[in-house]
Amino acid sequence: MSEETVPEAASPPPPQGQPYFDRFSEDDPEYMRLRNRAADLRQDFNLMEQKKRVTMILQSPSFREELEGLIQEQMKKGNNSSNIWALRQIADFMASTSHAVFPTSSMNVSMMTPINDLHTADSLNLAKGERLMRCKISSVYRLLDLYGWAQLSDTYVTLRVSKEQDHFLISPKGVSCSEVTASSLIKVNILGEVVEKGSSCFPVDTTGFCLHSAIYAARPDVRCIIHLHTPATAAVSAMKWGLLPVSHNALLVGDMAYYDFNGEMEQEADRINLQKCLGPTCKILVLRNHGVVALGDTVEEAFYKIFHLQAACEIQVSALSSAGGVENLILLEQEKHRPHEVGSVQWAGSTFGPMQKSRLGEHEFEALMRMLDNLGYRTGYTYRHPFVQEKTKHKSEVEIPATVTAFVFEEDGAPVPALRQHAQKQQKEKTRWLNTPNTYLRVNVADEVQRSMGSPRPKTTWMKADEVEKSSSGMPIRIENPNQFVPLYTDPQEVLEMRNKIREQNRQDVKSAGPQSQLLASVIAEKSRSPSTESQLMSKGDEDTKDDSEETVPNPFSQLTDQELEEYKKEVERKKLELDGEKETAPEEPGSPAKSAPASPVQSPAKEAETKSPLVSPSKSLEEGTKKTETSKAATTEPETTQPEGVVVNGREEEQTAEEILSKGLSQMTTSADTDVDTSKDKTESVTSGPMSPEGSPSKSPSKKKKKFRTPSFLKKSKKKEKVES
């Protein structure tokens, strides 16, 4: 059968474009043999191909992991059917026949029994943490076998499971180190009596456990004991000088104790002598002419001690055999050559990386566990330090928490084809928002439409953090130190005094404006504008016609030079003297228009313009304003000039009523900027016509009464007309 399969496997593939019946010639002997083959042979070949594919699947590590996950999931649900049991058998078979990850390793084995053979149902009756303890002890047995340190008898590794109940784990008698599994370990008490029998049928070696029980009774702090009697350790234990400090490994071992062991620990005197010899802190016990025992608080520490002790013994035996005696060896001094256990072993990352405390020998033991897992032993060890470092996320991802995490679901029903693209885009935005919520910030942006309408209300939007213009406050800073924002090179006592002072103010509930800013000390805030002068001049009867939107009258003297101010003072003094002379002549000739002309400066030039042309256009040019200033200056030089014809200030010819003058005055106040310049200059001239104080500043006339609201000039004018008529 095998001869027939060789040509079939070696035959070249037929061309793809040729028909099936044209591929073979009828005279071809291979074709004739295949055509005459029996149907059962063809079926056998097909089954062989199927089995080949099944074998490839079973040897796949991914399929094995998936199968183990399925078994664990079903066992958690409580499904203990025969199918699950069959799957478990398949998984165990695949684990025992799988190839090693590193086939070039010298310790490669073709067949191995998995260490962690505890299933979910078996782990229910175990104590807390006992499953991991069983896996560790079984792994140590496998390491002793791989390193060649295992002997046929009295090579035991024990572990204290519970301090309260004094239960211990030990391998059964007659089981080699390569056969020990987690389920085969036996749980015994301090007397060596079986508490829980393992999966094997072998008993406990009570004679070999006597030494371990005596050490556990003398040292309650010890959790693990490893007993070896390899040729190197037995040779060193037979030497009178014991272990010599000839290597670095001998220094790493630490303090040692020597005890004359006779092979039994049945007598009470032997236990007392062992306790005295061992002491409270010693971790290495050398049994004379027998071997060594390593003690440890953990399994990792015990294996760390026994590993370096075995290496030190091998170095010493080799050195003595080559040197010919102790006098030819160079011994290290313990005080000068101290090992760096704290920096290299006990503290992981003291030289590189963060300070993270670890147990003695933990990193070395985890490296060996990874080696066993790669070889397919399935140690079941729980790693504290992962082999591949995970990528650390940047702090910016958590500096700003997510403000909004909710989203709106789409409405039920068939999606509209026209909106399908929009829905997909919305879904992408929602997914991106949920995945990275910290890349968006809530920003108040002024809407252009609302700004054009005059509404200052901003518009709230969400923008990316990179697109937002950062303010002076910047990004939030994580406070890691309470004095992070204290200025450098400051006295700590001053900081404490200031802090106590602030706390005292908080206790007394003192309300203040807070510390004054040094940057804003020279800034002067703008005062709110006072109500317009025109609204103050309105009478109480005309309160309905007030206009609150009018602006304050500008200062009439702001645009004058020093020379003009001096001329203005002289003109005011001169007119004041003329007014005093006119008051005496006024009762004699009240109706004379020529004598009333000097009194015209009391009336504002703006009112003269209103009487002359009440319908003045609001858009006057600046040239007319300059002409008015020139005419006002000419009037100051020639005080006796008369007013134009047809204009009567206090006569009956004025037909305009007070209401009309008031409405026209208000309409002229709302004109453009050109009219404001003209009116400001006219008001400047009107102020010049008023009385002056001795210092030169305008002041009120002593004949006027102090009132809350000053009566407008055009109302006074109407009262004067009534007096003249009477």
UniProtKB/Swiss-Prot annotation:
> One GO MF term, please?
protein kinase binding
**Protein location:** Cytoplasm, Cytoskeleton; Cell membrane
The Basic residues compositionally biased stretches are 702-726
* Membrane topology label: Peripheral membrane protein
Q: Where is the composition biased (Basic and acidic residues)?
A: 566-586, 621-631
SMART domains in alphabetical order: Aldolase_II (SM01007)
- Per the record, the major location class is cytoplasm
User: Which intervals of the chain are annotated as region Disordered?
Assistant: 1-25, 525-726
Highest rank taxon of the organism? Eukaryota
Residues covered by region (Interaction with calmodulin): 425-444, 704-721
Q: Which residues carry this modification: Phosphothreonine?
A: 55, 533, 611, 675
Tell me where in this chain the PTM Phosphoserine is found. 11, 25, 60, 344, 530, 532, 535, 592, 596, 600, 604, 613, 617, 619, 621, 686, 689, 693, 697, 699, 701, 703, 713
Q: Locate the compositionally biased regions of type Low complexity.
A: 588-606, 632-645, 689-701
- What post-translational modification information does the record give? The N-terminus is blocked.
Q: Which GO terms describe its biological process?
A: actin cytoskeleton organization; actin filament bundle assembly; barbed-end actin filament capping; hemopoiesis; leukocyte migration; leukocyte tethering or rolling; positive regulation of protein binding; protein-containing complex assembly
Q: In which tissues is it expressed?
A: Expressed mainly in brain, spleen, kidney cortex and medulla, and heart.
Pfam families in the cross-refs: Aldolase_II
Composition bias of kind Polar residues appears in 665-674
Q: Which UniProt keywords apply?
A: Actin-binding, Calmodulin-binding, Cell membrane, Cytoplasm, Cytoskeleton, Membrane, Phosphoprotein
What is its biological role? Membrane-cytoskeleton-associated protein that promotes the assembly of the spectrin-actin network. Binds to the erythrocyte membrane receptor SLC2A1/GLUT1 and may therefore provide a link between the spectrin cytoskeleton to the plasma membrane. Binds to calmodulin. Calmodulin binds preferentially to the beta subunit.
Family, as annotated: Belongs to the aldolase class II family. Adducin subfamily.
Q: How does it assemble?
A: Heterodimer of an alpha and a beta subunit. Found in a complex with ADD2, DMTN and SLC2A1. Interacts with SLC2A1.
Report what the protein is called. Answer: Beta-adducin
Print the organism lineage: Eukaryota, Metazoa, Chordata, Craniata, Vertebrata
Q: What is the gene called?
A: ADD2
